């Protein structure tokens, strides 16, 4: 009951704030919409479409069969889970989460394995790390390989820790025998379903980006000067805008690099909500997922700290 009352008061307060600050709302919404339209829609929509199409056809079988001899013993996963690992590390938020959920819905992997995959297979894309982060934001293209390496390495290292939560008795080998061959659709039907699913997902992602862009516009007007607000909380709302904020602050290059690495590994609150949207059909623990992303962010920042101390 208290939570419901707090939600009501929060929404009423937000509504009044929007009424008295229409310029801030318009600016934030426009920034979020343009960011979605120019950078997210043309990049992410094709990946959402093609991954959905591959899951609905037999296309993923070749990927799983090719990569499972390496990934299966290394990560402790079943053969059918190899595709999610590829999506999670190559396609960016929240394609990895959607592939985990879709494979679980299709009966290709168990719910426990899907949740385990989510703990380390839903990451920022390599193009974002090497392009937007190292070149456009940090203006240090020589750090592109390092920016790419640390989040991936941290996620893989943390997977060995998270595995203990999901693999008490290695339950991931059973689902392969339970897969229903009727789940593969004719290409035209699979394409229709994939387009509809991709449109639904990309629209929800855009909605969250607009909401959090408006929120960060209001938060940026607050004149708090403490470390937690300026360097952690405010940039952690939305990743792209947060990195831009950090790069505009008067920070040492070492501290800036450490912070952007941590934020990229965490993904931001906006990415958390996008992920929650993609896994809504699953009974997975979202607080545990948040804890896993925070742990991965700390490991990434530790790698960045060691690198700056040794080579900075």
What residues fall within each predicted segment?
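Alpha-helical membrane segments and immediately flanking helix-loop junctions
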Residues: 74-138, 233-251, 257-279
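Membrane helical hairpin/interfacial module
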Residues: 42-99
């Amino acid at each position: 009951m208290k939570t419901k009352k707090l939600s009501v008061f929060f929404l009423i307060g937000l509504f009044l704030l929007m009424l008295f600050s229409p310029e801030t709302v318009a600016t934030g919404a426009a920034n979020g919409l343009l960011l979605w339209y120019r950078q997210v829609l043309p990049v992410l929509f094709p990946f959402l479409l093609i991954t959905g199409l591959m899951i609905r056809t037999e296309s993923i079988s070749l990927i799983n069969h090719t990569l499972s001899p390496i990934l299966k013993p290394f990560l402790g996963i079943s053969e059918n889970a190899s595709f999610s690992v590829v999506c999670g590390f190559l396609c960016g938020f929240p394609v990895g989460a959607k592939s985990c959920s879709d494979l679980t819905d299709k009966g290709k992997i168990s719910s426990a394995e899907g949740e385990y995959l989510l703990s380390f297979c839903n990451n920022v894309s390599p193009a974002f790390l090497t392009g937007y982060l190292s070149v456009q934001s940090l203006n240090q293209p020589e750090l592109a390989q390092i920016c790419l390496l640390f989040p991936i390495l941290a996620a893989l290292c943390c997977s060995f820790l998270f595995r203990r939560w999901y693999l008490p008795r290695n339950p991931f080998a059973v689902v392969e025998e339970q897969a229903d061959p009727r789940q593969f659709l004719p290409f035209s039907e699979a394409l229709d379903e994939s387009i509809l699913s991709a449109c639904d997902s990309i629209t929800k992602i855009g909605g969250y980006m607009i909401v959090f862009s408006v929120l960060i516009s209001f938060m940026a007007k607050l004149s708090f000067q403490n470390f937690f607000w300026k360097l952690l909380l405010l940039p952690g709302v939305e990743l792209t805008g947060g990195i831009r904020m950090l790069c505009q602050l008067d920070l040492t290059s070492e501290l800036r690099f450490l912070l952007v690495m941590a934020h990229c590994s965490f993904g931001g609150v906006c990415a958390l909500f996008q992920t929650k949207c993609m896994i809504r059909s699953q009974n997975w623990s979202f607080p545990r997922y948040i804890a896993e992303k925070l742990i991965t962010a700390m490991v990434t920042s530790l790698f960045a700290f060691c690198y700056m101390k040794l080579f900075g």
